[in-house]
C-alpha cells in the first residue's frame, strides 16, 4: 500500500454491506462480526469477521486513517459456500516474497480448476443474475458463483479505472487470474447496472475478547501484539520517515517468531509463580524444538495453538499447557457498552443473546480444520470471581488447617518430590570407560 499511495482502495467484500463494514472497523480494537442473510429471522448467516490481522481489514483501516476512498467491489451471492484451500503458511512470504509465494500456489489453482473454469468463463451470465437478484431461479454451483463474482469485480474495477489514476486492489489470490482475464477482455462482461439489492438482514455483533480465537486467523496474542505494534506508526510518524528503506525496515520489524517465544516465556513465569515449579533452560530449549518439529510435520513453518499445547504438555505438564493456552488466546479488548448485541462464539457457530443457535459461514474460505482435541486435564474455573473463597469461608469451622504449618509441609513435600526425581535420574546414569581401538 505504501509503495503505491493509491487514489482508491478496492477490496473483495460485498458492496451492499459497505456501511456496516466501515462502522465495524471504526470500532477496532473491539472485535465485530457482520452477519447477513436474505431472511429476516435467519437460522444461518454468512459472516464477515472484522479481524485486525486480516489484509483486507487492515487495508481498509489504513485507507480510513489516510483519507483514501474505499470501494467494496464484490458480489453478494446467496447460499455461497466457497471451496476451502489449505494454503501454505503465509509466514513464507517474509522469506521468499509475495511474488514467488503467488507463483507457487497459483500452480495449484490452475491444476484444480483450470478446465472447468475455462468452459464456464463465457457461459455464466452476470446480467441474468443481477436482473433476478430477488428471485434467483437458477441454481449455481460454487465455481459458477465464483465466476459471477469475478466478472462483477472486474466490471467494478473497470469503472473505477475510468475515474481514478491509481487503484489498489486487495483480493484473494484464487480470484486474480479470472479477474485479470475479464479486465483484459471487457467484451466478455455484460453491460449492466452494478447496484446490488440490500440484504434483508444485516447486523453488527460484538465479540468478546474471550471468544477471539474463534474468529481470528492468527493466535489472539499475535493479533494483540500487531495492534500494539501498529500504534507506533501513526500518520504523523509515517510522514516523518524520509526514505522508503527506512519505512520498509520499520514495517518489517514485526516478528511472529519472537511473539511465540514471548508466549512460552510469559507462561513459564506465571507457572513458576503459581506452582513453585521451575522450568529450566534445557526444558525451554526442548520445548521450542519440539513445537517447531510438530509444525514442520504438519507442513507449517510456525506452530499453531495445537502444536504449542501438545509441546507444553509433553515437555512440562498440563498446568503449564493451560498457562500457554491463557497467554496465546488472550485478547484484552472488550466493549463493555451495550451498543451492540454480543454473540457467544464456538467453532461451529454462535449463540445470540436470546440463546438461539446460528450456523455461520465465512464469506472468505478458510480452513480451520476440526479443532484437534488436546488431552489436557479439565481446569476448574470459578462460576464467579471469589466463589472458591466464599466456599472456603462457609466450611472454615469444619476445616482443620493452619496456614503457616501448611506452607512448611507443602514446601517440604515439594523438596522431597524434586529430590526423589533427581535420585531416580542419577540411578539411570551409566558411565562407560572410553577405550580406544
What are these regions (language model features)?
Residues 1-437:
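Compositional signal for N-terminal targeting/processing segments
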